[in-house]
Curated annotation (Swiss-Prot):
The encoding gene: nifD
Name of the protein described by the UniProt record: Nitrogenase molybdenum-iron protein alpha chain
Chain segments annotated as transmembrane: none
Enzyme class (EC, first level): oxidoreductase
Organism annotation: Methanothermococcus thermolithotrophicus
UniProtKB keywords: ATP-binding, Iron, Iron-sulfur, Metal-binding, Molybdenum, Nitrogen fixation, Nucleotide-binding, Oxidoreductase
Assembly behavior: Tetramer of two alpha and two beta chains. Forms complex with the iron protein (nitrogenase component 2).
Function: This molybdenum-iron protein is part of the nitrogenase complex that catalyzes the key enzymatic reactions in nitrogen fixation.
Catalytic activity line of the entry: N2 + 8 reduced [2Fe-2S]-[ferredoxin] + 16 ATP + 16 H2O = H2 + 8 oxidized [2Fe-2S]-[ferredoxin] + 2 NH4(+) + 16 ADP + 16 phosphate + 6 H(+)
EC number: 1.18.6.1
Pfam families in UniProt: Oxidored_nitro
Amino acid sequence: MPYILLDCDKFIPERMKHTYVYDPEENILPACNTNTVPGDMTERGCAFAGSRGVVGGPIKDAIHMVHGPIGCAYYTWGTRRALSDNEFHRRYCFCTDMQESDIVYGGEKTLEKASLEVMEEFPEASGTFIYTTCPTALIGDNVDAIARNIEKATKKPAIAINSPGFCGVSQSKGHHVFNMTFYKWLKLKRKEFPEKCMPEEEKTPYDVALIGDYNMDWDVAVIKPLLEKIGCRYVTTFTGNASLDELFQLMDVKLNIVHCQRSAEYIAQMINDGFDIPYTRATFFGLSDIAESLYDVAKALDLPKERVDQVIKEEMEAIQPKLDYYKSKLEGKTCMVYVGGPRTWHWIKAMKDLGVEYVAACCTFSHTDDYEKMNKNFKEAGIKDILVIDAPNEPELEEAVKTLDPDFMLVGLKERYLFRKYGVPTINSHSYEEGPYAGYRGFVNFARDVYKAVCHPVWNVLKEGEDKFKNFKGDLNE
């Protein structure tokens, strides 16, 4: 089926290239990762949010300094539930709080003073990440020089991340910038501090690192035991609940396992190119994808398949009774998904595992390869006629909900409030309701939260209330 133009987009015909209905007989990929059309009420985030809010922020023992107005610090605290076991991580927000005078006269002195004060207040911090924002990048503050000054004064690492909000079309650019900057910095510092690298005598043929997991509601605490059960030695995570020192060992493992394939595959590719360490892609959401990922890891490390079979059997036996109950309640329900990038296609087989029908997939910052994977998963799951929208705006989302009338939606942090007003149950599949959602036990948590949202009696009350006002609404329309 060709691309389609939604009714709400008649004044922005360019949006037609971003919207299609999946058909296995057609090879359609939408326009994506492009500049937002003026007048389009986009839901995208900025590049700064991608670097600070997504990839960098979960590093648990470093100071994350936002060099910009206090409004930019919204993305630093109380948004994504990237949890850690560090006492000050996520409890504090560090920002230079740029004022008009700083914009006029420059903010470098303000940045250096604030960073040194924070390091004095928190001597346990391992180092400092400094993130530029739109105003500080536009006035040309030399944050790289300030980072060098801070490093010299504190004798601890200071890393400048130059990803102001305007430097890319979406938060995806911020992911890329952080990956590249951190890789270059780490490669240099490993030579400077060889004692932080893993000693040769400690290395094993089964060392792995998890790339692109940010420990939402302790996902890492579920994934790590799974990998260890099949025979891996878990070394570190990029970046969920990881310390700066632990990340020095990213280049010492035998295999990198890439979970979020949009925000962190960049660094896995660079490590592969620079250190000849292979990587494999994995999805730890949904029964089918978890099993496939475990087999892929075992194959890459030459681990016995029988061990993986046994682990899967044990995990399934532990969750089957609860899973059967939730599946019986959700069978035949319809779901619309609106998330950032990879999770749009991560959830395809997971929905099928629950007996849920997937009716629409909307992505904020997906690239071409994300849509290729999405179409592949649709085909493997045997489903078609799915509405797909790249970087949807608010009217498009409203029209999709009104047209498709899904039983529930998987959404992110900010969209759920709009759709709940429409009477559509929502589940936060971005930062979770009550996770973890990864792994077998996490999938039961996910099924439980979907069940609690969809089957909550409040929706019946709302529908009864709507029925009472039908005649009244009809009179008004006439």
